[in-house]
Amino acid sequence: MSTPSSDEVNDSILLSTKKLLGVDPTMDMFDLDVIMNINSALANLNQIGVGPHEGYFVNGPVETWAEFLGHNNLTVLQNVKQYVYIWVKRVFDPPGATNHLAALDNTIKELEWRISTGREEVIRGDTEHV
């Protein structure tokens, strides 16, 4: 398993999510909508044990993935980024076809399982896969 680069870890949660959504990071007209949905995704992740115990909220472009995850959960970074992106996309820019929406829902469920399992492996210290 590769270690995330410092640029990936220190990325702004808002700006990296906007980039994945295809929204120009310099445009702020959709920030409120994107932030609200990011915070919803982060609350879901917090309920499965990822992020600070007291919760975490994005208010703008300064909050980073490292702040949310801490240094103990960096092994789940890519899954967490993908989860937040898909969660926000599903609400902010949903697909028109129901089968595409179902695919996003299935991906969200799979990522929740992977993130939860990855978090448990870190807690147990079982990072070696056989």
Predicted features along the sequence, with ranges:
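Divalent metal-cofactor coordination and adjacent catalytic microenvironments
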Residues: 1-130
